[in-house]
Every structure is written in structure tokens, then in C-alpha cells.
Amino acid sequence: MELRVANANGSCENGSIVSLYCSSQEVLCQIVRGISPEEPYNATLITWQERVRKKYGFYIGVGLAFLSCFLIGTSVILKKKGLIRLVATGATRAVNGGYGYLKDPMWWAGMATMSAGEVANFGAYAFAPATVVTPLGALSVLISAIFSSYCLGESLNLLGKLGCVICMAGSTVMVIHAPKEEKVTTVAEMASKMKDTGFIVFAVLLVVSCLILIFIVAPRYGQRNILIYIIICSVIGSFSVTAVKGLGVTIRNFFQGLPVVRHPLPYILSLILGLSIIIQVNFLNRALDIFNTSLVFPIYYVFFTTVVVASSIVLFKEWYTMSAVDIVGTLSGFVTIILGVFMLHAFKDLDINQISLPHTHKNPTPAPAPEPTVIKLEDKNVLVDNIELASTPSPQQKPKVFMTDS
């Protein structure tokens, strides 16, 4: 069997027609993309990868975000149980600078689960915009709230369950209205955006505020105010998200055959990511050691998401290409998620369930106040008539005279 190739016009430019002859069969092919000898051998594979990414990349990113939420929500429970066991042994607590939890297998199981969740989160940021992946973290709040009621004995009443449903509704709205296209595709573009003056000023403000919280505010008020440790974790978390996003672009460019190994940005981002994870784990353990899990995680999610979305707006400018309807929809979804998280936390101590709900009544209307007793002053004639004599007065007794003023 002989295969012959013939070109009608003698040109190999894009759009040219090439004929393939095999025995008595003829096939006409059109050149869509030419590959020069200088291009890498996997250029055809790159084209296929790009087609798959453009068509399914957004949904792959959302799926990885859901998986990440499940793993991270579970890891919080495991780490909390490890910290509880540490307190039971009498060792130095994490909030007091102790690191005894490093010897607890339950805590390490939580760290392993969280690492797997972060890997899935890493992949999600590589495929989907940060304004989609980060708000979906509300589902990890939902998962931790459900598991904490079964594993840690923390109650989840009817309003808490309703808050979970509201979180899922808000996440769905955000996914529908979030930007589908990612504008940063190369390491050079990522480096150019990080050199932008607006992002540099924003990053400097975050670093300065974080240093003030760590070295001045946290030693004095960290054990009394839950917001101190959570704000530190949230601010540092925004840098970790930026680093993950940049490393995701680096990995894609590496498999596309682009020269990214010699670029300094991947190494800088790796250093930022490592430092961010260490600081986050340290202060998140302190918050979990003192405060309730159902209190720490929802508040942490709200602050973390707010800072990350602000960072995404400054760095990637993903919102600039969105329509007004999508912007309003995304903000509405985010506010809905915050309301759901608020319901999870604010009403967690109320004893409200499906059984007691029908018997819940409004406070009864208070009875009207009784009228004040009015003492009516009698006149002198009535007073005289009402005098009762104990007995008939004897002649020796002097008469009693009552004086009344008229």
C-alpha cells in the first residue's frame, strides 16, 4: 500500500489544500497550523492541550475546587482533634508557643489531608480564575461545620443548616457569573503584572500591616481577640494564592516547551509560597487551640476571601472585562455566602430544630397594667357618721371632741 502526498498550489501556508492518495482513495486536507523545524516536537500535543483547556478548563478548575473544599474542611477537624488530645496530655499548648502537636499522628493526618486539598486547590487556580476558586472555599466551611457537629460535639441547628444551603446557593451564583477566561498565560505576563505600581503598593501595605499584627498586636491581644490571628492568616493567604496562581502558569508553560526554568519568577514564587504556608499553619493552629472551630473557620473564610478577591482585582484585573450583570451577580453571590456564614456562626447556640419549630410562639402580649388605686378623701360629715363607739360613755369620761377644718 503506497501513500502519496500532493500539493495543488505548491504552497505550505496555513489554509493550503493537500491531497493524500492511498490506493484508489483520495483525501483532501487543509493546513490549519504549520510547524517549523525550530518548534518543539510536541507542538501538536500543545495544540490539543490548548483546545481541551479552552473548552473544559473552567469546569476542571471548578471540580478541583470542590475536591479541595472537601479535603480542607476535613483537615480542620483532624487538626482540631489533635490539638484537643495535646491539651489532655498537659503539654504546652500551641497558643503558648508549644509544638507538641508535631508528635501527634492525628494532627499529621490533618496536615496530609490539607496538603492534598492544597494540591487540588493548586490545580484549580491553574484552570479557573481566582475570583471563582477562592469564594468556593465557603463549601469547606460547610463541610467543617457538618463534621464538627458529629466529631467534635459542636451542635448545628436548623438555622446553621439553612446557612449551609445559603452558602451553596451563593457559590453557585458566583460560578455562573464569574469570568471564564484567564488573561495571564505566560510567566512573562505574570512578571509584568507583579511589577505594576498598583500591585506593589498593595503588597507593601499588606506586608506592613501583617508585621504590625505579628510583632505588636498579637502578643498583647491575640489570646483575647479572635480577629488578630485570623487577619494574619488571611493577609498571608493572599500572597500564597498569588504564588499558586503564578506557579500554575509556570507549570503550564513548562509542558508547552517554553523556557521557564531560567526565569527567576518561579523560584521567587516558590519561596513566597513556602513562607506563607509556614506562617499560616502557625497562627491558624493558635486560633484553633483557643477558639471554637465553628467560630474560627467561618470568620477566617470571610476575611481570607475578601483579601484574595481584592488582590485578584489589583493584580489580574479580571473584573475589567466583565459585564455589569456579571459583576453584580458575582458580588451578590459573595454577599450571599457571607450571610450564610454569618448564620452559621451567629445562631449556632440557639436550640432550634425541626421538632421544636412548630411549638415556637411569639412572646405573649403583656396584660394591661392595673389602674392605680385612688384614695378618695371623705368630707367631715361622712367621717363623723363612720365613727364607731366601743361602748356608751360614762359620766366620768370627758367627751371626745373631733376637730375638722371646713
From Swiss-Prot:
Highest taxon above the source species: Eukaryota
UniProtKB keywords: Cell membrane, Glycoprotein, Ion transport, Magnesium, Membrane, Receptor, Transmembrane, Transmembrane helix, Transport
Cytoplasmic side: 79-126, 177-197, 247-263, 317-326
KW Lipid metabolism (keyword) present: no
Reaction(s) catalysed (UniProt annotation): Mg(2+)(in) = Mg(2+)(out)
Any Pfam family the entry gives: Mg_trans_NIPA
Transmembrane spans: 58-78, 127-147, 156-176, 198-218, 226-246, 264-284, 296-316, 327-347
GO-annotated cellular components: plasma membrane
Compartment annotation: Cell membrane
Residues glycosylated per entry: N9, N14, N42, N292
Membrane topology: Multi-pass membrane protein
GO molecular function: magnesium ion transmembrane transporter activity
UniProt induction comment: Up-regulated by low magnesium ion levels.
Topology feature Extracellular, residues: 1-57, 148-155, 219-225, 285-295, 348-406
Example of a GO biological process term: magnesium ion transport
Signal peptide: none
Role noted for this protein: Acts as a Mg(2+) transporter. Can also transport other divalent cations such as Ba(2+), Sr(2+) and Fe(2+) but to a much less extent than Mg(2+). May be a receptor for ligands (trioxilins A3 and B3) from the hepoxilin pathway.
Family to which the UniProt record says this protein belongs: Belongs to the NIPA family.
Protein name, as recorded: Magnesium transporter NIPA4
Species per Swiss-Prot/TrEMBL record: Mus musculus
Taxonomic lineage of the native organism: Eukaryota, Metazoa, Chordata, Craniata, Vertebrata
